Amino acid sequence: MLGRKLGKKTAQAKGRGAAAAKELGLFVDFSPEDMMLGIPDDPDDGDLEAELAALTGVKAVSKPKPKGKAPLPMEEIEKMAQDCMTDMTGEDDDDDLEEDEELLAELQDVVGEEEEVEQSQPSDTEESEPSASETQEHTEPEQQVNSSVAEIQHNLQVPAGGMLQVLEERIGNYKEAISNAKLSNESAKARRYERGLKTLESMLSAARQGRTVIEADIPPPVACGKPAVSPTTDVPTTDTSKQGLGDLNDVPMETTEAVTNLEKPEDPVSKATTNDGGAVEKTHVASENDTDSKTVLLLRQRDYKLAALKAKQTGDIEKAKEYMKISKKFSVVLEALESGQPVDLSNMPAAPEDHEAMVTESKIIAHPTPAPPVSNILNTQGSSVGSLLQALQQRMEKYKSAAQQAKSSGDDRKARMHERIAKQYQDTIRAQKAGRQVNLAELPVPPGFPPLPGMEQTEEEGSVEKALEAAQKLAKTAGEDVDDDEDECQAKPPGHPKPTQLVKPLVMPAISDNEERLLPIKAPVKVASEETFPPAVQEQLEFLEHRKKQYRKAALQAKQKNDLEQAKQHMRVAHTLQVSIDQVKSGKLVDISKVPSLPDDEESDFVVVEHEDIKSPQNSEDVYNMLMKLLHEQHEKCIRYSKQFTQMGNVAETTRFENMAEDCKKNCEILQLSQAQGLDPPPYHFEDKTLKIVRVFSELSSTEMLLIIVRGINLPAPSGVAPNDLDAYVKFEFPYPSSEQPQKNKTLVIKNTNSPEYEQSFKLNINRNHRGFKRVIQTKGIKFEIFHKGFFLVRSDKQVGSASVKLDKLETQCEIREIVEVFDGRKPTGGKLEIKVRLRDPLNGQDLQVVTEKWLVMGHVPRK
């Protein structure tokens, strides 16, 4: 069709068909089974000759059919079975199969039923066997191997016609064994079974193709095992691995002679072979005892190896090493037992489970948990010293472990903090051992630990409820009665675990509460002075301790009002303050601007009035009301100034104003008590107090600037308009963020006056750190334009003047109050405009001011 001539192909040389096919890669079988099994040794294979004849076209010469192979002797079959059970890759390098624990456990499943029958028969039947003298020389594992070989021989007798069925059953057997071995984490056994499974699959494929499969090459059946390690097996000796030496009588040899010989091992001389029956029986019993001991040792060694493997898989390397060391000791004992030396099993280690329980119990005994504190622990000084050292040691270890955990998690700050606390505990332990006095109150207690011996009263601070109950007891004893003996109350020891007063309360319970509350504040100051803290650290410690006590008192008041949620909230804040106190003690200062502010006082509902407007009343009731209002006003000022200095981080001024606020509150309580009793008002007077305050407009944010147009003064009127007919309004323009996009607005129109009162506020958006804003503040300002409002379409709005305000003072002040001149072009008009500009705080520094105020003080006027 394409121009080719149909010609006769060149004839191929005769007899070259098979060679050409092989050159082209045809009829070449690279199957893995042939590579693994090899070519059969029989050169006269009829199937191969028939196939060759079909390929070459030559008639096959008929040859006499070879005779079948003679069956192999039992000794060779037994040897082949043992070779099949051996790992061909050399992974399990065991020279002696009799000591392989894994193979013993595997064979144990195969011959389990026979062993049960043997255990039910008395041991004397074994002695009556004609081969008793031979079995005496073998151990029980050898008998198990022989019985398994017998079963394997039985399984090897496969009918000729059921080869495919046998291979399929054998493959199913191996697959089940592989799955069970993988579930039991026996990787070596699983790999060995997988190699046998590959061989079986190759044989099955060869059998399906019609090729001959040699029965002797079929891998023997294996024990499927069990999918999980059961607590007890059919072999009774496994029970002995879970018992002590006293349970060794439960070994399968249950005869009295075996027990006697186990307790008293026979002398090696008595094991000499003799011809009389008594000597044979004695040697047999001794051999059985050795077999039992060896079985127990092998099983116990296997248990420890399995326990080491499980510990390694769970990541407990130390426990795995310990179990492996114990299992190696069993090898030494087994060698001694095989050499004929007597072995005492009384010191044999217990099972891994019992060993773990014993180790745990020994740890509990070595490190007992501290007993709960008792009421008379301070009286037993001899026992308290030891328990105190133990408690300190436990807490030091706890902080060391916490530091290690923090390091491992990457939290270096927390790790350093825990290390400092651990060092503090270490110094305390050294001082305690040296007999020096130590202050246990400054040691932080780790969470979950009981209080140190001798410090039981701090247990009440462990939880919110206990702290509130203790504080409530203090409050109840303070308000029961008015008449009291003050000296008797002062005689109470301050270090009582539960400071309850059995005497009547003072006349002024508020003062006693305050004194009770201020006592713990002085203790940390004393400790700080003993440890020579720097002045800044000591100042912050006093401030934080005082703030903590205030929150605890607020929690007490909330508890008395049955407001448990508020009380718990205050106690949580007190605990966070304790963390800050520990941080300051460790040498790191805190930012007091982030310290929680003073707790809100719900009893401070009042209306602030100016005391200049109050006239001195004649009635005592009016005097009480006036004093209460003034004290509330002073208290509010102190709290406001304290918050301002807290934001600045000034500890000294913050503490000063907080103390002044406490004095005002105490005076209010005195007035309330006196008024309730119907007494005359206590003496009082006014003093001029100089206060250093910081001006902060807290209602503004850092991105806001407030512009207030207050009023206009004598604004000029346009021509033709009388001053009283001026309808003026003010426009302003603030050139930020840019001159092209300024912020601008205007006021309302105030009609018929040239001195309008506007009092209008405008919030402007700013960015304090922006260079453009700073340039506007320094060089420009805010421009104002005053307009006269026109009427309808007759007149338009007419400008009557302009003014501007410089803002450079905002760098050092938070408020500018200016009365600026109104100009008509460059000509002054005589009118003025009052303007206020406010920031939250100055751009640079703080707006500190010194003011003098009249301060109400309760008491007589001091004499000069």
Swiss-Prot record:
Low complexity: which segments have biased composition?
Answer: 229-241
Which InterPro entries does the entry link to? C2_dom, C2_domain_sf, C2_Freud, CC2D1A/B, CC2D1A/B_DM14
Q: Which SUPFAM superfamilies does the record associate with it?
A: C2 domain (Calcium/lipid-binding domain, CaLB) (SSF49562)
> What stretch or stretches form a coiled coil here?
91-118, 162-209, 385-412, 464-488, 535-564
List GO BP terms, alphabetically: regulation of transcription by RNA polymerase II
Biased-composition ranges for Polar residues? 142-154
Q: Which cysteines are joined by disulfide bonds?
A: none
Report keywords, A-Z. Answer: Coiled coil
User: What domain of life does the UniProt record list for this protein's source?
Assistant: Eukaryota
Biased composition (Pro residues) is annotated at 444-453
Ranges for domain C2 = 685-820
Which cellular component terms (GO) are annotated to the entry?
nucleus
In Pfam terms, one family for this protein is CC2D1A-B_DM14
Provide a Gene Ontology MF annotation, just one.
Answer: RNA polymerase II cis-regulatory region sequence-specific DNA binding
Record flagged with keyword Coiled coil: yes
Task: Please note every region of biased composition (Acidic residues).
Answer: 89-104, 111-129
Report residue spans for region: Disordered: 82-154, 218-249, 441-463, 478-502
Q: Which family does it belong to?
A: Belongs to the CC2D1 family.
Q: What is this protein called?
A: Coiled-coil and C2 domain-containing protein 1B
Source organism per UniProt: Xenopus laevis
User: Gene encoding this polypeptide?
Assistant: cc2d1b
